[in-house]
Amino acid sequence: FVENYLPLVENGFDLVSANKIANTIGYPFYKKLRETLAQYKKQYLYETNVGAGLPLIDTIKLLHHSGENITRIKGIFSGTLSFLFNTYSASDAPFSEILQKAINSGYTEPDPREDLCGNDVGRKLLILARELDLENEFEEVTIENLIPEALRQGSREEFLSRLKEFDPIYQQIKDNAPAGTVLRYVGDLHGDLSQTATARLDVKLVSVPVTSALGQVKGADSIFEIYTESYGENPIVIQGAGAGAAV
């Protein structure tokens, strides 16, 4: 449907969308859309692209357009994966059991591999990078796929019947985590963010101190830390519900 965005704007329509496609496909389209919006004095509202109902994108826009130098954005972008690893880190239950609970609770996509592959988090991170006028493409995002190689192909039904194959892999990761840490699946926009070539976009499973802001997250909450030149090592933190029917 995004191919209709330009003619819609040209014919006098504002745009409102929860869909991420227009903000994550090739940068030439992204740039052309914004030039067209400016030319026709129209708005494109997409706050829910990242962070569900949290006021994240608007906050980043306001900071950036005010001249504040944003130096890093780090956070838990997926409410689904937040629930998985928050629960897993605090429980003795096997990973497959917690994943099944997430499926039953409606936290995941119909095929949970859409959440577990990490691409959705990668797209969200890319959207934030582009808000800082970086011209990165999706292919430049480094994404850790959480799905064991043997389970990435095949039908949804076959995948759901083999969830126990996750257990030894994630038990080993959990056992190897340093004491006093918990597992979190984190998106991290860092490096020199003043230019596209030096910006780094990483999405991966990491161990964080249990006492940190990311380590304290509960349930299916999302959390975002926005580091700026003015605030130094004390980031602006935005946190709230990241998954579930209500959001």
What do the PLM-derived regions correspond to, one by one?
Residues F1-Y5, F95-I98, I223-I226:
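Structured alpha-helical segments in the cores of large, soluble enzyme domains
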Residues P28, G51, P55, A90-E97, ...:
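Conserved active-site and cofactor/substrate-binding residues in soluble primary-metabolism enzymes
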Residues E97-Q216:
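Substrate-binding/catalytic subdomain of NAD(P)-dependent oxidoreductase enzymes
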Residues V2-N11, K20-E47, A52-L63:
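Rossmann-fold NAD(P)-binding glycine/threonine-rich loop
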Residues R72-K74, S82-F85, S89, D192, ...:
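Catalytic, metal-anchored helix/loop core of enzyme active sites in primary metabolism
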